[in-house]
């Protein structure tokens, strides 16, 4: 303040800066919070499955000779489709997400994003992914992506999830589609190796999901979702986990004629390791011991990544296939 009762120019600027800085910080925090909320709707961790399985499928389709631009465009389109499906799944499951401890922090469960905005966001991602794949790859891959979203939202989320304990068995087919999309983006068709990769993920999904659901079975009971561990005994669940683990390993071995020796060796060794864990879980339950199903859940991720990474390396370096 000057001696004449006036505010000095420097003081005005300083005061303005002091008033604007908190507002700027708050505005930035709100924007960042909104961006992170929309990102969380897409379930980025789930999208990792796309990267782990789609790239090896594309490399196998052309024995490593596929153009990098095709890979990039397919991954972008595939990730948008997966993000759209996951967002729409969050919209449909908002009511049960509020009840379950594991999902209570999801954006719609805590009202961080308006439901209508999330719905528009999910639909927009789905439509854009279809046209992206159609224009950058081919119509078949775009249609497969569109069918995947529709199946995941309407068949799994709205029809199966709340009605049957076999929900993840049949609903898990949506998670198998990245290999089909990747293969079709490169070749424009579908062939038996793509179906074999589909089978690997199809059979892998139940033991992977049920192992996690065993840990959170009380959540599913509270939400009224008939996930197998919530409606069956631990012995019944672990027996089913063991059966599907065997089917998973057999499916990986069925793919060996189209792959090279590296994949065959890794599939055999990793399969033995995966089976050992499943047998240990089942044996522990039968013996009445305290078991740790979450360990199988976490290691099942490593198993799938290891098998498909071996397939990618095998295809990229062009090792001779077992078919010659």
Swiss-Prot record:
Pfam families xrefs: UbiA (PF01040)
Major location category of this protein: membrane
Region named Disordered: 1-25
Membrane-topology annotation of the record: Multi-pass membrane protein
Organism expressing this protein natively: Mycobacterium ulcerans (strain Agy99)
Alphabetized UniProt keyword annotations: Cell membrane, Heme biosynthesis, Membrane, Transferase, Transmembrane, Transmembrane helix
Entries under HAMAP family matching the protein: CyoE_CtaB (MF_00154)
Gene3D superfamilies: UbiA prenyltransferase
Gene Ontology, cellular component aspect: plasma membrane
Stated role: Converts heme B (protoheme IX) to heme O by substitution of the vinyl group on carbon 2 of heme B porphyrin ring with a hydroxyethyl farnesyl side group.
InterPro entries named among the record's database cross-references: Protohaem_IX_farnesylTrfase, UbiA_prenyltransferase, UbiA_sf
Positions of transmembrane segments: 65-85, 117-137, 139-159, 164-184, 185-205, 237-257, 258-278, 304-324
GO molecular function per UniProt: protoheme IX farnesyltransferase activity
PANTHER family with a match to the protein in the record: 4-HYDROXYBENZOATE SOLANESYLTRANSFERASE (PTHR43448:SF7), PROTOHEME IX FARNESYLTRANSFERASE, MITOCHONDRIAL (PTHR43448)
Protein name as catalogued: Protoheme IX farnesyltransferase
Similarity section: Belongs to the UbiA prenyltransferase family. Protoheme IX farnesyltransferase subfamily.
Reaction catalysis annotation: heme b + (2E,6E)-farnesyl diphosphate + H2O = Fe(II)-heme o + diphosphate
BP term (GO), one: heme O biosynthetic process
Protein location: Cell membrane
Upper classification of the organism: Bacteria, Bacillati, Actinomycetota, Actinomycetes, Mycobacteriales
Entry EC number(s): 2.5.1.141
